[in-house]
Amino acid sequence: MLDKIEELSPAVITEELFGTGCVWDAYSFLSSLVRRAKHRIILIDNFVDERTLFLLDKRAAGVECTVHTRFSKQTELDFEKHNEQNAEIKKIQLSLHIHDRYLIIDNEVWLLGASAKDMGHGLCTVIKVDFTPEMVLSFLK
């Protein structure tokens, strides 16, 4: 009986490799991660624009969302206009010394090989890592 349940259950993907030009595949994968969130989403990504905000809007109602990024006047405007009409996405200025990108979905941490907005334009990987969200966030202070 357990074998049948395992056979019928979808496999949990913990890593994915996207080739150059696989923009839709990468976007769909990130979208599925965002939709899985029950409590919180935290994105750590130096390069965010309105495409990222559209992606994060796929989260369920009541899921808190925070983005750690470097923001320019345009990014500030994107967040301001977004938050006037949609569920708030909080923003926190990111240090210049942060290179890697992370997507935290509840208590899972995913390492992104490219910015969420650019995923699939070039070869990139998304992989679930065994860090706690608190461990990653502690390095942002």
Residue ranges and their predicted role:
Residues 1-26, 36, 47-141:
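PLD/PLD-like phosphodiesterase catalytic module centered on the HKD motif
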Residues 30-32:
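Exposed extracellular interaction/assembly regions and N-terminal maturation sites
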Residues 41:
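Catalytic histidine site
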